[in-house]
Amino acid sequence: MSVAAMTMDDQRPCMNSYDKMPPTKYEQNLNILNSSQNSGATGGPASPTPSGLEDHHHHHHPHPHHHHHQEQQQQQQQQQHLQQQQQQQQQQHAAAVAEAVAAAEQRQRLLEDEIENLKLEQVRMAQQCADAQRREKILMRRLANKEQEFQDYVSQIAEYKAQQAPTALALRTALLDPAVNLLFERLKKELKATKAKLEETQNELSAWKFTPDSNTGKRLMAKCRLLYQENEELGKMTSNGRLAKLETELAMQKSFSEEVKKSQSELDDFLQELDEDVEGMQSTILFLQQELKTTRDRIQTLEKENAQLKQAIKDEVVAPAAATNGGTNTTINKLETIHEDACMANNPTNPDCYNGNTNNEQIAAVPQIPLSDDGSNMNGNAARLARKRNYQEEEALPTVVVVPTPTPVGNNVQEAPPIREVTAPRTLPPKKSKLRGITTRRNSQLEEDHQPVTTPVAVPMIVDNAVAGMASEEAAAAAAAVNNSNTGIIPETGVQVGVPVEGGDPGAPAAPGRILTRRRSVRMQQNGSGAVDYST
């Protein structure tokens, strides 16, 4: 694009760039351009043809060959010098032109950058203007909405004011309102009272208008004061009497309520104590039931083991007496397991014949049977092992041991049941009472604190001359004397009276009475009686 083809708008950035260019550089460019134009106009490029002046001088001044040669050399030197100057000028002109072109290109690039920046700024400003216009529209719309709401509120306020304005009908309904009527009635009463007080005050003022020397007026005023004081005292007395009566009634009601509360609290404590006692009794009953169950299970197991042990001992005892003096001895033993409530059965056996005489022996199968025969160590060891296995308890009572002795009685052989003393189940102590400061304890519990109570349980065994069966503990206690006199055997034990017992068992002689006494003590404990002395 040439400078002439550029419009004024396009030339303005160039003019601005020329204005911005430093003056020294601008002057240098102008000098270079002027020098290049002058050199081109005057000399131009060196030509081989001589000029007119040179030709005239060459023709009109003939000189010798040497002089002509020097002139040619000088001309050549001048030409070379001019050529060098021209070349230098051309180079300077080319450099100036290149600089001018570079400056123009730089200005053009700057102008293009400025144009791009201006376009971007124009786009940005247009966008900002659009945003501003959009915001203006939004704000105008909001303003219109607010104005509409404001007008609506104004109209609503006007309607409310118009509605609240009292009309004639509203006033009439207000007069018919019970609350307004009550208010008017009170105002009327207050007005009447005020008028009455005003009249009384006026009358008093008129009565006070007497002379200071009049005695009648003075007496009347003193009497009025006295009556007024008496009236006040009477009112106080009546009010005080009523208040005193009400206070006494209130005090009586308070005392009655306190008594009721106290009795209720006592009843609550008593009921709580009863609940605790019932819980304790229930726990005791449960514990006793568990103990009874375990005791029954143990009794059954011991009965089974006892039956096995009796069979083994009977076989061992009867086996050595197989033959005596050519005779035979056969014994048939019938073992039966009898429960506590059942009777003992009579088991007939074959008699033992010794030289034609009948011999019946009382055999008591007990956990431990000490035999006088030294050759039966095996039997004694077996009995001791059985006793050690079956009777490992916390505290074992002395066992009654019966030694077989011959008696000239019937031909039947029976076995007596052994005595097994089972410790009575423990009972839980009662809980403390809240009404009483001391612990409530029964006589049976006090007795338990002093000495333990053991309840014997009879285990059936085979004994000679068995007594009649016992239906209950009371029947056994009642028939004890008859059994002692008829058969000579102590009930509940199967021990014959007068039979010698080994001296190594110190508790055997006192066993029957002690067992019966303990049975009675258990029954007395259940009935709540006093303690029993076990020393008898």
Swiss-Prot record:
SUPFAM superfamilies: beta-sandwich domain of Sec23/24 (SSF81995). GO terms for cellular component: nucleus; RNA N6-methyladenosine methyltransferase complex. It is found in: Nucleus. GO terms for biological process: cell differentiation; compound eye development; female germ-line sex determination; mRNA modification; mRNA processing; primary sex determination, soma; regulation of alternative mRNA splicing, via spliceosome; RNA splicing, via transesterification reactions. Residues 28-39, 72-91 have a biased composition (Low complexity). Residues 254-319 form a coiled coil. Associated component of the WMM complex, a complex that mediates N6-methyladenosine (m6A) methylation of mRNAs, a modification that plays a role in the efficiency of mRNA splicing and is required for sex determination. Required for sex determination and dosage compensation via Sxl alternative splicing: m6A methylation acts as a key regulator of Sxl pre-mRNA and promotes female-specific alternative splicing of Sxl, which determines female physiognomy. M6A methylation is also required for neuronal functions. This is Pre-mRNA-splicing regulator female-lethal(2)D. It comes from Drosophila melanogaster. The lineage of its organism: Eukaryota, Metazoa, Ecdysozoa, Arthropoda, Hexapoda.
